[in-house]
């Protein structure tokens, strides 16, 4: 299998697939066959380089993306991509602009997934992601989905 750009992320596994990002700006999902060989692959163009390892949970893929500006600039167009996966591919749910390039894997917390935040008597299924970003002075960002 050939990828667009260097693979700098960790390869993560979820439900029969491996996922990784590239400096060429792509997220890949590759099927793992029962015998350990690769099966069908699909990719998604993130629009900027990605070295952070993706996090996959309940049909969502979360990954940090470098913007088109300077890598460590606070106004470089950096964002955190929230993607939706289906059997046939990957699509963008939304992007969240952030103040610096997120190069590390996020921490996903399900601690409040069963909370009812809108008062309708049903759990909202909300997860929280925490990740670092690289822009002076540095920082930690939180996203809920």
Where in this protein do the model-derived segments appear?
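Extracytoplasmic/lumenal domain signature
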Residues: 1-145
């Amino acid at each position: 299998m050939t990828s667009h750009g260097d693979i700098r992320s960790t390869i993560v596994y979820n439900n029969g697939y491996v996922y990784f990002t590239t400096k060429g700006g792509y997220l890949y999902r590759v099927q793992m066959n029962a015998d350990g060989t690769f099966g069908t692959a699909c990719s998604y163009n993130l629009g900027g380089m990605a070295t952070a390892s993706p996090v996959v949970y309940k049909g969502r893929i979360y990954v940090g993306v470098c913007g088109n500006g300077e890598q460590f600039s606070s106004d470089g167009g950096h964002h955190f991509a929230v993607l939706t996966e289906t059997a046939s591919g990957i699509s963008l749910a939304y992007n969240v602009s952030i103040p610096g390039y997120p190069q590390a894997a996020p921490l996903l917390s399900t601690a409040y997934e069963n909370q009812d935040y809108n008062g309708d008597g049903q759990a909202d299924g909300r997860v929280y992601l925490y990740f670092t970003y690289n822009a002076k002075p540095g920082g930690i960002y939180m996203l809920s989905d």
